[in-house]
From Swiss-Prot:
Protein name, as recorded: Peptide deformylase
Name of a matching Pfam family: Pep_deformylase
Keywords: Hydrolase, Iron, Metal-binding, Protein biosynthesis
Database matches in HAMAP family: Pep_deformylase
Cofactor (UniProt): Fe(2+)
Gene that encodes the chain: def
Binding residues for Fe cation: C93, H135, H139
Entry EC no(s): 3.5.1.88
Function: Removes the formyl group from the N-terminal Met of newly synthesized proteins. Requires at least a dipeptide for an efficient rate of reaction. N-terminal L-methionine is a prerequisite for activity but the enzyme has broad specificity at other positions.
Length: 170
């Protein structure tokens, strides 16, 4: 296994819609393992393939550090098939380091996809797991959590981010 580089905003791959995974082979299993190791090392609770430079519909999520009930979830070609309610949660992102903001999402979701073994699976989630799944699936659509901020907060973020990038290159 290997630690992969995490792409950060404004890397263009973060704005691309991920390609559907057509088959599960050794290369995909290695990517899953590498993404999982990268997520743990970061540390994070979720990671989408495009965050590590691969335009594939693949996510890994593990809330075990936050919630003993859930372990590692690997989802290939995940889709949200049902939603209910609304929740606001303080979110951050490995691709937008050191920035956190409250984001409105669905309180409950049902997600379908395939596991690393190729078997179809369905996950019913609420709370942090629902938020994490929606956040990672957004990545696969080329969306970042900052896109869900209200216009004023998003504008403040963009100004702060430009200043941060300018300082980093000075």
């Amino acid at each position: 296994m290997a630690i992969l580089d995490i792409c950060t905003y404004p890397d263009p791959i973060l704005r691309q819609k991920a390609a559907s995974v057509e088959n599960i082979d050794e290369a995909l299993i290695k990517l899953i393992d590498d993404m999982t190791e990268t997520m743990y090392e970061a540390p994070g609770i979720g990671l989408a393939a495009n965050q590590v430079g691969r335009s594939l519909s693949l996510i890994v999520v593990d809330l075990q550090r936050q919630d003993e009930e859930h372990g590692l979830i690997v989802l290939i070609n995940p889709q949200i098939v049902a939603t209910q309610g609304e929740i606001t949660w303080e979110e951050g992102c490995l691709s937008v380091p050191e920035y956190f903001s409250a984001v409105k999402r669905h309180a409950e979701v049902v997600v379908r996809g395939y596991g690393r073994d190729g078997k179809e699976m369905e996950i019913q989630a609420g709370g942090l797991l629902a938020v994490a799944l929606q956040h990672e699936i957004d990545h696969l659509e080329g969306r970042l959590f900052i896109d869900r901020l209200n216009p004023i907060t998003r504008d403040i973020f963009k100004r702060k981010w430009k200043k941060k990038l300018k300082e980093a290159t000075a």
